[in-house]
């Protein structure tokens, strides 16, 4: 690869694509999973959240493991882990075992995700990194686009279980090619032990908070089953912050947040991706349960979002590089909020041209305006030496926002129990859910410290040689929707 061979690049791209496709297809399969297991909405939430929880909690820690012990080694270990967990998911006899297997699958995703781009950065000559990063970004976008098609077809034609089983042959190809073509690399300048305590504190803390937020609607927010996990989780997260302040090799360098621009960019990221996750979690279920869409129809309903982002995201990132990200980071969330408000108009008829398409088109336009400048603003706020860590932190903030949103928004709008199985009730509750999400995105548009460019320099470039927006635009995009096509 150092001589320009591209086989290793394709291996890492395929690894990233495997996790991306898996994330997009699960949302399409939720109604089928619920029917097979007679599962309530809380259990379906945990099918999604258990994966996101371990992925978000361990992502930064797994990145440090690759830097210390070898990126190829950790990447391939993550692929094996992910594949074995996928096998258990595919044969899960109950919702409880599926949820547990999804949590284990998230650990594998955390192990392989950081290495997928880091291997390219470390293995290619500087002159080749831009091209390699572009291939990585482009195929990630393709994976995001085909995931809903593949998931909808598998669920409709065969079984939801195949969305997990399909990972096994893909993983076998990755391992066989990776052993041969991916070179080993590590950061020889690192010393000391990895931040194991930090990884445990943040993961268990997020678990406690998430569990309490999901348990609240069923048993009451002030009752011990909901209140105690939230309190314990919050205390553990506070301990995590205190630990990171004094750790010799912290998993999360808190010094990054000394920059007001970096902090503001991540606040806006949290708001935008919280609203995004709520939309992408609910809409496939709503279209199938309320509007009568088949799984494949629901799977391709968000295709306009992907298309708009593919066409406009690079242009939005280039504009932010010229004029600074303040305008787009302020206007974009307002457009997202408008699109989310239109989701509330989608009813039992589910007419694609008059109800679904306007909502997803405006929603996608807002994402295209916002996402790339946000990433650029976060990277511009730090030195080039910390660009990789800043990118990882921003990505982790997006995933944590998705976790919290899926836990909170359904309960806040009354979507509990088996409401999703009753179209009339689900339609009314989902309208409240859609109406609540613009409140997540709108504060981002009015954030008083909207990210602004650093006068002395343009937004920093990622170490891979490509601009930041090229490999971020579609990372956390998970889910799908449509009218009768």
What are these regions (language model features)?
Residues 80, 201-206:
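Alpha-helical transmembrane segments
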Residues 6-21, 26-28, 41, 116, ...:
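12-transmembrane solute porter fold
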Residues 1-180, 316, 323, 341-344:
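Transmembrane-helix bundle of Major Facilitator Superfamily
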Residues 160-200, 248, 258:
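Conserved aromatic/hydrophobic "specificity hotspots" at molecular recognition or selectivity sites
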Residues 66-67, 71-73, 129-132, 188-194, ...:
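Interfacial helix-loop-helix linkers and transmembrane-helix boundary segments
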Residues 1-4, 188, 450-485:
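Intrinsic disorder in cytosolic terminal tails and internal cytosolic loops
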Residues 95, 159, 186-191, 216-222, ...:
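Membrane-interface helix caps and helix-loop-helix hairpins in membrane proteins
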């Amino acid at each position: 690869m150092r001589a320009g061979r591209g086989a290793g690049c394709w291996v890492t791209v395929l690894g990233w694509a495997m996790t991306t496709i898996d994330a997009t297809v699960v949302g399409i399969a939720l109604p089928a999973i619920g029917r097979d297991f007679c599962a309530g909405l809380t259990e379906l939430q945990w099918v999604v959240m258990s994966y996101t929880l371990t992925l978000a909690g361990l992502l930064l820690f797994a990145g440090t493991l690759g830097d210390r012990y070898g990126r190829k080694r950790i990447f391939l270990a993550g692929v094996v882990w992910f594949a074995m967990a996928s096998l258990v998911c595919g044969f899960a006899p109950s919702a409880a075992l599926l949820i547990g297997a999804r949590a284990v699958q998230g650990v594998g995703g955390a192990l392989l995700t950081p290495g997928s781009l880091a291997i390219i950065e470390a293995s290619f000559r500087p002159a080749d990194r831009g091209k390699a990063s572009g291939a990585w970004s482009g195929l990630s976008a393709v994976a995001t686009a085909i995931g809903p098609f593949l998931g909808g077809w598998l669920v409709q034609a065969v079984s939801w279980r195949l969305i997990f089983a399909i990972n096994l042959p893909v993983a076998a190809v990755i391992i066989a090619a990776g052993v041969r073509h991916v070179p080993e690399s590590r950061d020889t300048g690192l010393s000391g032990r990895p931040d194991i305590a930090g990884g445990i504190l943040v993961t268990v803390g997020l678990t406690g908070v998430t569990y309490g937020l999901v348990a609240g609607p069923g048993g009451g927010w002030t009752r011990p089953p909901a209140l105690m996990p939230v309190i314990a989780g919050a205390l553990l997260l506070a301990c995590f912050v205190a630990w990171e302040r004094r750790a010799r090799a912290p998993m999360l360098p808190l010094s990054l947040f000394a920059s007001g621009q970096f902090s503001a960019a991540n606040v806006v990221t949290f708001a935008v991706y919280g609203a995004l996750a709520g939309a992408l979690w609910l809409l496939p279920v709503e279209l199938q349960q309320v509007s009568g869409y088949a799984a494949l129809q629901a799977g391709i309903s968000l295709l306009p979002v992907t298309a708009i982002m593919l066409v406009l995201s690079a242009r939005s990132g280039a504009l932010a590089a010229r004029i600074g990200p303040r305008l787009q980071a302020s206007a974009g969330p307002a457009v997202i909020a408008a699109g989310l408000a239109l989701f509330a108009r989608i009813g039992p008829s589910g007419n694609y041209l008059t109800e679904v398409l306007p909502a997803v088109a405006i929603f996608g336009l807002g994402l295209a305006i916002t996402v790339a400048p946000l990433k650029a603003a976060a990277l511009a706020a730090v030195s080039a030496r910390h660009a990789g860590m800043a990118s990882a932190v921003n990505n982790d903030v997006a995933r944590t926002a998705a976790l919290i949103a899926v836990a909170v928004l359904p309960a806040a709008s009354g979507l509990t129990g088996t409401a999703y199985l009753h179209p009339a009730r689900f339609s009314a509750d989902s309208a409240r859910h859609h109406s609540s999400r613009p409140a997540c995105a709108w504060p981002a548009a009015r954030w008083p410290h909207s990210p602004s460019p650093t006068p002395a320099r343009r937004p920093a470039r990622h170490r891979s040689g490509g601009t930041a927006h090229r490999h971020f635009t579609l990372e956390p995009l998970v889910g799908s929707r449509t009218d009768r096509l």
